[in-house]
Regions:
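Helix-hairpin-helix/helix-loop-helix acidic hairpins
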Residues: 31-59
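C-terminal catalytic region of ATP-dependent kinase domains
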Residues: 68, 80-180
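Conserved protein-kinase catalytic-loop segment immediately C-terminal to the catalytic Asp
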Residues: 73, 78-80
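Short, flexible loop/turn elements at secondary-structure junctions
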Residues: 8, 19-21, 61, 81-83, ...
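Active-site alpha-helical segments that house and flank conserved acidic catalytic motifs
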Residues: 58-67
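A structural signal for short, well-ordered beta-strand segments and their strand-loop junctions
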Residues: 1-3, 16, 74, 91-94
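Conserved ATP-binding subdomain of kinase catalytic cores across diverse folds
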Residues: 1-32
């Protein structure tokens, strides 16, 4: 992932990534891939598809709980399939995390992270991020969280963030990983 200017008229930047689709491999949103309309149904779909695919789904949802992604709806994650045969190949890479990591706070509001974290909720109803993680966390996800013990952000040369902001945000991510 990288950063790029959203448009020439503003100073806003956005996260970018390479396209993961090719003429041979296409992306199908969760809502269309399995014909379901809830995260509970998604869990069942991935379990039926196989444990490795469920583990990928669980890791994405625990990651969302880690970064407080408030926008994980059923069209911004899904599967990759063979464009010619329709065979399901794998879960699509994680993307569209723009409404996370306290995106709504200004750089000078780093001391608001703990307070903000108390009120942010995931996109699926009637569950907190802590509950979301608790329902899906397993040994693989715990190992992934443990690996964040010395996590830090790499700043972008073309679009730098204030170092104090990145340091405080990385500290919050490390503490959050321990909590989960």
């Amino acid at each position: 992932y990288g950063l790029a200017r959203w448009d020439a008229a503003t100073q806003n930047v956005c996260c970018t990534c390479d396209c993961f689709c090719t003429p041979e491999v296409s992306y199908v949103p969760q809502a269309l891939a399995f014909g379901q309309s809830s995260h509970t149904a998604a869990v069942k779909s991935y379990l039926r598809w196989g444990l490795p695919h469920f583990e990928d789904y669980a890791s994405m949802m625990v990651f969302d709980a880690l970064i407080y992604n408030t926008d994980r709806h059923l069209t911004n994650f899904g599967v990759l399939r063979n464009s010619r045969t329709g065979e399901l190949l794998d879960m699509a890479p994680v993307f569209d995390n723009g409404r996370s990591l306290f995106f709504n706070l200004a750089f000078d509001q780093v001391d608001s992270f703990p307070n903000e974290a108390q009120f942010v909720l995931p996109s699926w109803p009637q569950v907190t991020f802590d509950e979301q993680a608790a329902r899906l966390i397993g040994p693989r996800q715990k190992e992934q969280l443990t690996a964040l013990g010395d996590f830090s952000f790499a700043n972008c040369e073309q679009h730098p963030f204030p170092e104090i902001f990145l340091e405080k945000l990385a500290g919050h991510v490390r503490r959050r990983a321990e909590e989960l």
